[in-house]
Each structure stands twice: as structure tokens, then as C-alpha cells.
Amino acid sequence: MISCHSFTMTPSAPNSTVLPSATPVCPQSSACRWRGLIETYRPYLPVSDQTPVVTLLEGNTPLIPAPAIAKRIGKDVRVFVKYDGLNPTGSFKDRGMTMAISKAKEAGAKAVICASTGNTSAAAAAYARRAGLRAFVIIPDGYVALGKLGQALIYGAEVIAIDGNFDDALTTVRQLSEHYPVTLVNSVNPYRLEGQKTAAFEIVDVLGQAPDWLCIPVGNAGNITAYWMGFCQYKELGKGDRLPRMMGFQAAGSAPFIQGQPISHPETLATAIRIGNPANWDKAWAASRESNGEFHPVTDAEILEAYRILAAEEGVFCEPASAASVAGLLKQKDQVPAGATVVCVLTGNGLKDPDCAVQNSGNQVKAGLKPDLEIVAKAMGF
């Protein structure tokens, strides 16, 4: 029996109105102009008329059919990928950051801070600068993809690299936010999860129902927590009559949920989920337990294979950590019920880590050819 005991609807903020039905203000299927997550799902978020909405029109990302992956599973299974790499800064973090920064500005904050493996720093910097706030970012030195670091820098974040891992960085920013006038915007900030839960709303709005399985990469465990919050809230409002199994997948070298305890030295090429001590530990376990879900490990080799399949067979270019959801689905395909609908969450854009694509594509540039018709045609196989 699947239930939502640990996740209740967010109380309405003062001066906000809860609609009697679960119909969003501006559903994906409508022809109206997209206005960003807060305006679209305002009745279901802890905002009021006094909340200054800071938005880059995030959300409304596509739910893309994945027939090549479905064919590998068989059994008349339908597979979709929720491609959050098409958010403004290229990852799902924008969903949470529109809420976190809007509420920080409402509270009078002048600066925000986060620890990051890359995506959080990009989103925090973009939304903070749009709001006119300073953005401080603490990163683990040498463990952030250049595409993500470049984003944070060009947005104007004040970046500090520490000799340590993400967990060390998170401990540092938590301490700083307790002693200095900076607002913490990592996923321990509850407004982050409120924003991120809207991805579940969008999936139900498109499918008309929750999927049977929701496959998701797990790092700091905020996203699996947020999706479960969203599915539970929508069901309580009468939007659909079922809940998905939450299937969380971790890199084998960075898998505290599989080991059942935090780990000190996580290692994986999927840097976005290279986290040994997830901040949302208890909530993620609750989401898994209440949904009859599971956590499973996937190796770096399995992640890279799924990464290549998504690009070469589905035309979807995601960052390596995102592909953990598809790697996990393929690894657990014998468990998938016949006729099931499965959604795999792709958390970030492949352009976040172009070096990984170049190094692992299995493809090569045929360089040094003369601009001669016959020579080029021969290189093309004609």
C-alpha cells in the first residue's frame, strides 16, 4: 500500500488562495504564455501577494517519449524522459532556486550562499543576480565540471574553492549561514523542495496520471524528496488516483543509501551526484519506503552506456549524472511490470560537462583532410 504519511500539503501562505480543484493556473496543455513556476502553480506553493517573484521562466520542460529505451525493456512498457536540462541554467536546480531566491528577497536578504558540485552554483548565481543579491559559492576544488563553473563565474558569483568534497563544503556553508548575514539556498532550505516538486505536477499534467515508476538520480536526495512531495500533493488534490514507485539510483562509488550509512570518500565521474552524506537523508528514505520504492547502485560504466544510448538513439544529450536514472532502469528492467509507464528524470544538460562527451562518445573527428570532393566523400564512406 502506497501512502504519503510523511509528506503533507504545504499550508497556504497568507493572502494566497487554494483552488478547489487540482487544475493549475496555466497547465502545459494550454495555449497560454508560460509565466514560470511560481505564477503557474501559485495555489500550491507557499507564496503570498507580498512575495517578489524572481523568475527566468523556468519549468515547462518536455516529457519526451523514449521508444529506443522502451524497446530494450519490452513488455509494452512506455518510457519517457523528463528533460530538466532545458531549464534556464541547464538543470532542475532552477525549479528550487526561483522559490528560494524569491523567499530570500521577501525576507530582506542581501546575499545568499550555497555549496555546490556545479549545478546549484549556476542556478543560485543566476537567480541571485537577477534579484540584485550577492551570491557566494563554495565548491570542492577540482571536482566541478568546467561548464558549470563557467556559468557561476559569468553570472557574477563569488566563488571559493576548498580542499575537500561536497560534504565538507555543505558543512562550511551551514556554519557560515548561522553566523553571518547570508541565506543558505542548498536543498536543506525547504523552499528549494517546494519549487522542485513542480516537476511532478508537470508530469501528471501531461500524462493525466502519475507514472508507475519514477526513476531518478540520487545525490543530495532533495529531488527524490521533492518529486514525492509533488505527487502526494497532487493526488490529495484529486489529480490522478495513484502514486509512483520512487526508484532512486546512485553511482556505485557514491552510494550511501545502498550502504545504509554516509560515506567519507565518494568517487564517481558523475560529479553532480558525488555526495557521501545526503542532506535529505531521512526524507528520501521516507519517500522510498512510502512509495514501495528502492535504491540501487549503477557503475560509472553503466552510467556512460546510458549516456551514450540517450544521445545516439534518443537524440537527448544529458549530463552524466542524469543518465544514472536510465542506467538504473535498464539494469532493473526485469522488475518493470508489463505495460507500465516509466518516467526517467534527466536533471541536467549535457553541455554542463562537454569534456565527458568528447572523452566518452566513442566517436572521433576525422581531421586534417584537404577540401577536396573525392577525399571528403571517401572519408564519408562513399
Swiss-Prot record:
Record field: catalytic activity: O-phospho-L-homoserine + H2O = L-threonine + phosphate
The protein's annotated pathway: Amino-acid biosynthesis; L-threonine biosynthesis; L-threonine from L-aspartate: step 5/5
GO molecular function, one term: pyridoxal phosphate binding
Keyword Amino-acid biosynthesis: yes
EC category: lyase
Keyword tags: Amino-acid biosynthesis, Lyase, Pyridoxal phosphate, Threonine biosynthesis
PROSITE patterns xref list: DEHYDRATASE_SER_THR (PS00165)
GO BP of this protein: cysteine biosynthetic process; threonine biosynthetic process
One Pfam family this sequence matches: PALP
Source taxon at top rank: Bacteria
Cofactor: pyridoxal 5'-phosphate
Positions that bind pyridoxal 5'-phosphate: 119, 219-223, 347
Residues with PTM N6-(pyridoxal phosphate)lysine: 93
Keyword Amino-acid biosynthesis assigned: yes
EC code(s) of this entry: 4.2.3.1
GO cellular component terms, A-Z: cytoplasm
Signal peptide boundaries: none
PANTHER family (UniProt xref): L-THREONINE DEHYDRATASE CATABOLIC TDCB (PTHR48078:SF6), THREONINE DEHYDRATASE, MITOCHONDRIAL-RELATED (PTHR48078)
Similarity-based family: Belongs to the threonine synthase family.
NCBIfam families xref list: thrC
Protein role: Catalyzes the gamma-elimination of phosphate from L-phosphohomoserine and the beta-addition of water to produce L-threonine.
Protein name (database record): Threonine synthase
Organism: Synechocystis sp. (strain ATCC 27184 / PCC 6803 / Kazusa)
